[in-house]
């Protein structure tokens, strides 16, 4: 029964449950014209949500699917530039990142400069509207403030995970995000 946590939309990936295998998901641009890739199912729903909000160009994808190699490069770069404490707080070890499933997306509010590791995605304005509708499109804010002890990850208000509409709604209703 516990084997199910390693597959499907509810796949659990973290330091205790590293990703299994190197199967690349079917990918698509996270939003039209974007070079950031996402699982095609998640990309379609993200496009629908951003379109509904008329927020194309305001909400921008920063990071989606990552290969093992890319995750290693991000880890190594952050260690050099930010140090070990920061890196352990905000960057997952290779094999332990939800991004490697293609189901996770880091989003930002459009700005001249966007921080790749901690992009700005505030709780008001169009970003707040995004959050209010996210579950209806299958997304949850994965690492909420106050849940660090449960997730083992620092709060990341920019990080959204596609789990599918019924799961996202249930998780929102029961406070499981």
Where are the language model's segments positioned?
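Extracytoplasmic cell-surface/polysaccharide-interacting catalytic and binding patches
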Residues: 1-64, 68-177
């Amino acid at each position: 029964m516990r084997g199910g946590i390693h597959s499907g939309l509810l796949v659990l990936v973290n330091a205790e449950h590293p990703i299994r295998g190197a199967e690349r998901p079917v990918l698509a641009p996270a939003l039209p014209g974007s070079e950031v890739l996402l699982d095609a199912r998640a990309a379609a729903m993200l496009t629908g949500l951003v379109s509904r909000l008329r927020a194309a160009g305001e909400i921008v994808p920063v990071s989606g699917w990552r290969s093992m190699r890319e995750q290693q490069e991000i880890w190594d770069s952050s260690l050099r530039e930010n140090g070990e404490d920061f890196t352990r707080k905000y960057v997952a070890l290779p094999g332990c990142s939800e991004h490697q499933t293609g189901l996770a997306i880091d989003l930002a509010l459009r700005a001249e400069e966007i921080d790749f590791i901690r992009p700005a995605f505030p709780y008001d304005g169009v970003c707040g509207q995004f959050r209010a509708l996210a579950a209806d499109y299958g997304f949850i804010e994965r690492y909420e403030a106050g849940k660090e002890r449960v997730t083992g990850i620092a709060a990341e208000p920019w990080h959204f995970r596609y789990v599918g509409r019924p799961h996202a709604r249930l998780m929102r209703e029961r406070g499981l995000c």
